[in-house]
Amino acid sequence: MQHAYDEHLATNRYFDRKFGLEAAKILPGEYYVANQEALLVTVLGSCVAACIRDADSGIGGMNHFMLPDDGGRDKVGMSARYGTYAMEVLINHLLKLGARRNRFEAKVFGGGAVLASLASSNVGARNAEFVLDFLKTEKIPVVAKDLLDSYPRKVYYFPYSGKVLVKKLHRVHNDTLFSRENDYKVRLSGAPMDGDIELFI
């Protein structure tokens, strides 16, 4: 059965020769889950990624999102609903694969101040604050984090083992990251947030 939120599942899958694993590249607004050995990869600027796994079974996943700019008007309202949706979609899919919520652990990354167009809204810091607050509220322990600062990061997540490799990109040789995040920001500003999502128990 297909769910409405399946449209956010990453579709860019490939075989990573360096690590010898099936891999998924997660773009802004997407997520991916795995119940076997796999590699999840993303590049983060102002966005954040939550890597959540069942520490016993190795079922895990990663999302990649940012809160829409609300101009500082709506700290816990509409803007936070986008982040909550991104987190709950990931958690629901993990539970659907058989993960147990009481065995979840999280690692979080991103929230850098890397886009000049987003600097005034401090969106990276808002994203980082949101993801930490969400996980605290949901009682999911954060076992590792690399947040804020002024550079992009490339994150390699191996959900089965929980291992993460983070490459800090002090030099970005093209504007792909920046254009992806700007495009995502534009999509967020025009997208209605209808309805709620219920947690799969």
From Swiss-Prot:
Family: Belongs to the CheD family.
Annotated catalysed reactions: L-glutaminyl-[protein] + H2O = L-glutamyl-[protein] + NH4(+)
GO biological process: chemotaxis
InterPro entries found in the cross-reference section: CheD-like_sf, Chemorcpt_Glu_NH3ase_CheD, Cytotoxic_necrot_fac-like_cat
Enzyme Commission no: 3.5.1.44
Domain of life, per lineage: Bacteria
GO MF, one example: protein-glutamine glutaminase activity
Protein's organism: Dechloromonas aromatica (strain RCB)
EC top class, as a word: hydrolase
Gene that produces this protein: cheD1
Protein name in UniProt: Probable chemoreceptor glutamine deamidase CheD 1
Pfam families assigned to the protein according to its UniProt record, in alphabetical order: CheD
Keyword Nucleotide-binding: no
Keywords: Chemotaxis, Hydrolase
Gene3D superfamilies with a match to the protein in the record: 3.30.1330.200
PANTHER family, sorted: CHEMORECEPTOR GLUTAMINE DEAMIDASE CHED-RELATED
Function: Probably deamidates glutamine residues to glutamate on methyl-accepting chemotaxis receptors (MCPs), playing an important role in chemotaxis.
